[in-house]
Structure formats: C-alpha cells, structure tokens
Amino acid sequence: MPPTRLTWAPGTGSIDQIDIDSLDKKSSVYFQGGEPTIMPEVKEFMQRCLAKNKTDFFLTMCTNGVKLSTEFLQLISNFPNTNFSISLDGYSKINDYWRSGTDWNKVIQNVRLLQSQGHSISINTVPGIYNVTNLHLLFEFLDQEFPLTAMYLQVNHLSWQSAFNHPLKDLVIESMQKCMQTSLYHSNGKSCKSGIDSIYNHYINNPVCDVASLKDFFAYNDQLDRARGTKLIDFIPELEAARKYTSE
C-alpha cells in the first residue's frame, strides 16, 4: 500500500519538526538537502526512531553515494523500507567530471552494497550540456548492471548548461535513440521517458544553437577547469569539439 502521508525534510532545519511518534507504515520521510548519509542530524533522527521502535515508515535518501560509513550502514539496516536515490549524471569519468569530488567506481560499489543489504535503489539524473551526447552510455550500463532500477530525470533548462543547447544535434539525436532502446527508458521512473522524448523531439526539429549561452558555458567551465586542474577534452571530447561554434 503506498504511503498516504509525507513528511518532508529537505535540510537540517526541518528534521526536528518531524513527529517521530506519529510515524507508521503509511508515513514517508524524504531527506534531500545536503548529504544525508553523513549529516549528524540525520544520524540522530534515525537513532531516535530506533529508540522509539519507529522504523517501518518509508525512508528515502537522496545521495551522491560516495560516503557510507560502517556506523551509517549498521544504523540504516534497522529501517526495512529504505530507498536510496543515487545522483548519477553520466557514465564513468563523465559523472566524475560533472559532479566533481565523486568517484564512479566507489559509487557503483556502494550501490551494490546497499542492494545486497536489501535496500531499494533509484537513479536521479540531470540531462544537460555535459551528458546530452553520451547519456546512452549511462542508460546502457544501468540496463545491464541494475536492470530493475528506476530512473528519475530532471532536465537542466539553465540557458548556459541546457540540454537543449548543444550544437552537435546529430550526436544528441543518436544518443537519445540509443536511450530509447533500453529497458530503463520504459521504467516507471518520474519523467524518464518524457524527458528523453522532449530532448529528442527538440533536436529533430533543427533547433538553432544560442551561441551567447554556449560562450557563457565555456567561459564558466574554463574557470572550473583552471581551479580543478582538469581539461574538458580529457573527459568529454565531443563537448570540447563544440567550442568551435562559439567563433562562428
């Protein structure tokens, strides 16, 4: 039976507002803000729930999946209805580049660990200019390695990072077509199919690239590369190849 009551906890300020005594099998608690797997406030909340024997509610944690301490894993094992929404915005080094500070291999290792402990997994992905030409690589990987996993898409509409402003439209169309061939595309994830369809339909209609926004993207990303000591071409060469369109 789906939960009929939602308790929303986007950040540390609202955790104390959760009425633990009222939590039951119909309740749902969702931790989104920050990184809940390392937040002391979330740890204290779970400990209080455990002390009151209130652990059978639906619990969702949105996480980058990088840091899972032994203490956290032992604590979360007491909550049988837990879903981890893992943020993955690309396959392998594409994800590590866009989500600087993450470690693809570690994240995948942790996803397998969480599944082995009986927790459910979903994937949260943001299509944007970084991954719109290669998103199929992530879809195909998840299809093969985590076939029962739902994906939630939140398309990036920011003009300078937009999934709808890549000048290499043929690469985008090809990637979207490959996404459509996966089982993940037909999963019950929120906006997965409709998100891919919207990107595909946009590019097959010969859109005109907003060059000013593309220039803004490269100016921003070049600053990031200088600060991080990275080079875009080493991670997403087709995006670096799009730079030439800024001088036309």
Question: What residues fall within each predicted segment?
Answer:
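Core AdoMet radical
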Residues: M1-G13, L23-P40, K52-S69, S77-I108, ...
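Arginine residue identity/basic-tract feature
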Residues: R5, K43, R48, K67, ...
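Short, well-ordered amphipathic alpha-helices
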Residues: S14-D16, V42-L50, V107-R112, F139-D143
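Conserved alpha-helix/loop element of class I SAM-dependent methyltransferases that forms part
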Residues: I18-I20
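Distinct, well-ordered alpha-helical segments
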Residues: E41-Q47, T70-I76, N134-L138
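Hydrophobic helix-cap positions at the C-terminus of alpha-helices
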Residues: C49-K52, L75-I76, L114-Q117, E145
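Conserved C-terminal portion of the radical SAM core fold
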Residues: T60, N81-S85, N105-T246
